[in-house]
Amino acid sequence: MSETSEQDARNLAAQHRELQQNAESVNQQLGMVQMSIEDCTRAILTLEELKSASGAINTMIPLGAGALIHANIADVDKIVVSVGAGISVEKTPTEAIETLTQRKEELGKVVERLNGTLTQIGQRLASIESAVGNRPPQ
């Protein structure tokens, strides 16, 4: 193999490794965004159930690390919703559902962009693999 084609092969191998790492990173981001979408979905469903309930609601609230506490929810007229940057605001259940639905839609767009990025990375990986596979033996 000539020095130039050896260097080309090393460059292609390095690009391939970098693209694989990028794909793994994008897949991790995709997983986190999908978990956020699932969180929004669960919150929306819970709010819809709470909205339709009458009287005090007996429930268990997670404290973390698998610990739960029994609680009675007497008032579901005000829901505290995070709006980012550590700021939370009180909203009606309907407003909270609207906010979470919008957030879910925005996250869906992020999923589409990440899937597009994964497709591009896959195409670049395929072209590198094709270039390496089509090289004449030296």
Swiss-Prot record:
Cell compartments where the protein resides: Cytoplasm
Pfam family, one: Prefoldin
GO molecular function: unfolded protein binding
CDD domains on file: Prefoldin_alpha_GimC
Record's keyword terms, sorted: Chaperone, Cytoplasm
Any one annotated GO CC term: prefoldin complex
Family: Belongs to the prefoldin subunit alpha family.
Its job: Molecular chaperone capable of stabilizing a range of proteins. Seems to fulfill an ATP-independent, HSP70-like function in archaeal de novo protein folding.
PANTHER family in the cross-refs: PREFOLDIN SUBUNIT 5, PREFOLDIN SUBUNIT ALPHA 2
Protein name per Swiss-Prot or TrEMBL: Prefoldin subunit alpha
Provenance organism: Methanococcoides burtonii (strain DSM 6242 / NBRC 107633 / OCM 468 / ACE-M)
